[in-house]
Amino acid sequence: ERLKTLGKSDKMQLTKKEKKTLLEYKSSASYRINELLRNHKDTDELPEQERKFVEELDSALSKMPQYEGNLIRTVDFTAFSDKNERIEKFMKEYVENETVTINQYWSMSKERGYNEDADIQIYVQSSKKGRDISSIGLDEKEVLYERKQEFCVVKTVNYNGKYFILLKER
């Protein structure tokens, strides 16, 4: 029995449509979908095509393994002329000892090394709920949180003009 399950990877449990949806999300759809999710509290408000995409992605993510370990996400507003205002607005959402709910899908990395000069670096300590999607598509060390994930803001620090946020899953 053990040999039967040994060779099965997590991505083999996905339907073709779910795998296609995950690949599409990882390429370019993430920006469009996450923007819609940020601006609409209820998926029923989304256009039908996007609503179906979200349903398919939710289904795919539910089949992916949960990642256990520490994660990092970087946020960089350097390309914007109103960089400082954007940073200030972003940081107002992260108040120590408060809960923050992420309405969109949230991509994190298992490893440091991606844009370490970013304005904001977000760390999740001892993750258990993020979905490990690194086996899908390019060899990225990506973990994706499902919609409406809640985090407790453990600590925020401004060090040499860079912000560091430590979160713990709720």
Sequence positions of predicted segments:
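Mono-ADP-ribosyltransferase
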Residues: 1-170
